[in-house]
Amino acid sequence: MEANASVDMFSKVLENQLLQTTKLVEEHLDSEIQKLDQMDEDELERLKEKRLEALKKAQQQKQEWLSKGHGEYREIPSERDFFQEDKESKKVVCHFYRDSTFRCKILDRHLVILSKKHLETKFLKLNVEKAPFLCERLRIKVIPTLALVKDGKTQDFVVGFSDLGNTDDFTTETLEWRLGCSDILNYSGNLMEPPFQSQKKFGTNFTKLEKKTIRGKKYDSDSDDD
């Protein structure tokens, strides 16, 4: 009896919340419709022109990004290319990888998807064997590592999978959320709610540049499949 009463009470509370939300949405729509009804022809024309201008600017921005190599996940051949690519784009994600590290291939699959979804960000990959100077300069020790570059400066790193739930089975949405936390792409979800369920266990402490140390020239792998 008590269990049924609790369920009924919860259902009523949920129903009331849904009704209140629906009412607020309807009121907002009514308000917007009323504003449009009160506009004269000149005001409607100005509104139309404003929206067309916004669409035009958005299309121009998209074409500019595409011309700079956004919209695809590309490999760059050398350290010199890394610096040149960073100069051209405001937001860059670069995957420092090694062919023999299995987890790098996992990241590749997710980065291909995100590169097509987030045109505002450039997605690159660079073989650590071809970038010894850069890896030392950025203090990259664990493979894979994502370097997150904004306005030509390295702002943050995603080292291994510790920020992604410590699992090889993390979703593209989890990586998207993590990159959104560093403002390296436009994240539309709630940054306070990580997509992976094990948030409490692993926490949300991210690896920062100042926490890195150089311990020799050999790279450590975050994967057991070396």
From Swiss-Prot:
Q: Where in the cell is it found?
A: Cytoplasm; Nucleus; Cytoplasm, Cytoskeleton, Microtubule organizing center, Centrosome; Midbody
Q: Which UniProt keywords apply?
A: Cytoplasm, Cytoskeleton, Nucleus, Phosphoprotein
Query: Which Pfam families does UniProt cross-reference here?
Result: Thioredoxin (PF00085)
Residues that the record marks as modified (Phosphoserine) are 188, 221, 223
Q: What is its main location?
A: cytoplasm
Tell whether NAD is among the UniProt keywords.
Answer: no
Q: Which GO terms describe its biological process?
A: microtubule cytoskeleton organization
Q: What job does the chain carry out?
A: Significantly diminishes the chaperonin TCP1 complex ATPase activity, thus negatively impacts protein folding, including that of actin or tubulin.
What is this protein identified as? Thioredoxin domain-containing protein 9
